[in-house]
Amino acid sequence: MKATLQNWQSWDIRITAVILSCLFSLIVIASHPIPNDDAFSYLKAADLYNQSGLEAMLSAYGWYGYSALIAITDSFLPLDTLASAHLLNMLSCALLTWAFITLCAECHHGERIPFFAAAIILVYPTINEMRYELIRDFFYWACCLSALIHLIRFHRSGHWMNAVGWMLAMITAVFFRLEGLLLLALSPFALLMSGKDTMKQRLYKLMPLGILGIVGLTGALLVFSLAGIHLVDVFRFAYRWYLPLLTDFTQTILGAADSSNLSYHLSSQLAPFTGKGLLVLLFGVLYSVLANLADALGNGLAVLTLYWAYRYKTQPEESARWPWLFFLGGSLFTLLLFVCIMQFLTSRYAVMSALMVLVLLPRYLDQLYVSARAQLRLPLFNKLFAAALFYFTVDSLVSFGYSKQYIEDAIDWTQTNVPADSMVQTNSYALAYFTGLVSDYDQVETDPLVTLGTTAGKHFLILALSHRDAEARELASMQAGLQEVAHFANKRNDAIVIYRIN
């Protein structure tokens, strides 16, 4: 395996993959100039960091280390905050690509493994579709994969430098998402599961990781404390909406059951935490987690992975197996907590678990390659593999949805026709930010019905309406004092309507 990692072909494929990853990011960003709604909170926090420093940013927004990095990048480069954020995301995707290929090479023997790993991560639709979004997750995933690489190497060699690499990667992951604390706490215990070593040898390997983890966290607490920032208070503030749900976890679970329509099957005759009621509850929660994971993988890829896992029963090599399983288990547990506490599904929170599953695919593809070569069907394998790459690339890089050009047109019109000193009310983050007419562009109320009721003292109302907002359209047409001055829409009738308030 060491020879494989040092092989120039393995090195070359990672460099090529990183370059392609950056190219894909540029393509996706260019075709999606309007970022996700969460992006505007990160941008506003970065602006606050530039104006008032880290303490003010953390006090106002909580655990926004990602925004601090955006602000620092913005101060060093001749770019605006948005461009700096896109640059960081492009680099984080490149780092994730590099880490995934390296991790697959650590987990499986074979000279073709890096190539298949590069192909998988580059055409993985869930990642590609999010490349234009400003999210801290890309760095978090990359750091977690890097930590797993170092943990596997430490498990194999016992070298302290790998232990230090694991600690630094995990501390950096925590800098982006506090959920990394769970993996930081759990992952070292993978070293206790090795079948070859005695328990004394396992404990001897575990000790350096425990010491380094404690030293790393203590050092971070001390540095921030000396800077006048109390991380415990920041943690409480960042999770102020979720901690009460954890303290009353029974009601939280029942709330999750109600949100997922499990309450239909639970009644006074079928208590939720005993007997059949408990089975129904566990099945529902487990189904939610697995459905979220399948959505993150993509339904087709999830079915193929399940089939190949059943047929080939492939696992990472022995020295990598338990660290990989602990990271998979930790990420699934984090997803479980998210589903129970937040009570809705989103594939983004399942990507870490999906990446752990995708680590198995290069070995499956390599086995298919070997089988095809033995059966003299290699040309067929190559054609099918190329077709799959083409399909996933087009599917994830080309947008087949309804155009959002109308949003850009509305922004251009507003910048040209609305005076800069106007008081503007809007329910669109994008219009608030790009027009420069709303100072608190991250505090937008997105409900058009609520926005229609908060126009007092304003000069213009810029209303974002989806094709389903019939009630808001009717109310706006009847509301006194609103004069429509511009209307922009796509073929589905998603629209931006601009009103002058008389």
What are these regions (language model features)?
Residues N50, C104, L151, L384-S439, ...:
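Membrane-embedded, lumen/periplasm-facing catalytic core of multi-pass transferases
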Residues S21, F116-P125, I149, M170-V174:
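Short helix- or helix-capping micro-motifs
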Residues Y64, A68, L77-L95, M130, ...:
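Loop-to-helix entry region of an early transmembrane alpha helix in multi-pass inner-membrane enzymes
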Residues L87-H108, S146:
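Transmembrane-helix motifs of polytopic, lipid-linked glycan transferases
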Residues S31-A45, M57-I72, L79-A83, V232, ...:
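Extracytoplasmic catalytic/substrate-binding loops of multi-pass membrane glycan-assembly enzymes
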Residues G275-A320, S331:
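Hydrophobic, aromatic-rich transmembrane alpha-helices
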Residues R112, L168, P188, G210-I214, ...:
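Signature aromatic-anchored transmembrane alpha helix within multi-pass, membrane-resident enzymes
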Residues D37, G62, Y132-F139, T346:
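Short acidic/glycine- and proline-prone juxtamembrane loop motifs at membrane-interface regions
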